[in-house]
Amino acid sequence: GKTFGCLAFAEKLKEKLKDKSCRIIYCLPYTSIIDQNYREFQKIIHHYLKQKYEEKPHRFLLKHHYLTSKTLKNRNDKNHNNNENRSYKDYLEDKLLVESWQPALIVTTFVQLFHSIFSNKNRNLKKFHNIINSIIILDEVQNIDPDYYLMIREVFTIFARRFNTYFLLMTATQPEILSDEIAIDLVNPEPFMRNSIFNRVKMETNLKITNSDKFLKNFTTNFKERNALLVVNTKKMAVKLFKSIEKKFNDFECYCLTNYLIPKDKERKIKKIRAKLDTNKKIIVISNQLIEAGVGLSCKRGYRDVSPLDSI
């Protein structure tokens, strides 16, 4: 919901600015959720532009992170053939397009954005001129390390005042990156939070469970649902808990999601989990913190290991 809401706001702001060269740069903390959001943006843009988007998709939308292929698909260049020299030329053109952020909407990571602003390497600076005069959306902004808040605040202020750049910070738990003097709250959450639709989750706390053995005993005794999500703080703990639960719950399909998985396997496993949940299969998912930034799995019951406030 908030992803589409912020994109709609950015488009309205772009219309008000009456600047066709203004780009929207949508930034996320993890590569694991970029593909999901990118596909949703593809659907929206294709719905409105149809053939224009099909002919030149990379004019309108681009995905960029460290795993992104530098060779773009769906090229409609009539001169594109298997000739070795021309293929290399196409590769260089594609690489330049990806690394310079020329399209109207870019989906990328915090790392790519901040490297382009703070780095002095030519590779990162290729896109600097396209960051200027743009609308930058930072989703799940609470994942930024607090040690960088002051530096980011100063840089954002300079970009906003001198380079006509707008920053939209999105999160359910807004950190103190920007002060009230330089930032505007777009939404007052109080009226929304009083709506009964948000009163759909019951939270229970148990601080007596201080280790994985105690949790496993409690979980084995009390768990009665058809599906559950267990989130812990480390990859090592996720694997340990997964092995224990898999042995005890033979009639459930158990999945472990951690950064030990390569991105392709992670995406494949998330798709499989989502399909199982949609058909109400008996399933238990154990994960570390990679699940917390918009991966989009909905289980009947969730368990969260004790963690810092910005992770809750």
What label would you give each PLM region?
Residues L62-N74, K235-K236, C254-I270, N288-E292:
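Conserved helicase motor
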Residues R23-I34, N222-E246:
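Conserved strand-helix element at the start of the C-terminal RecA-like helicase core
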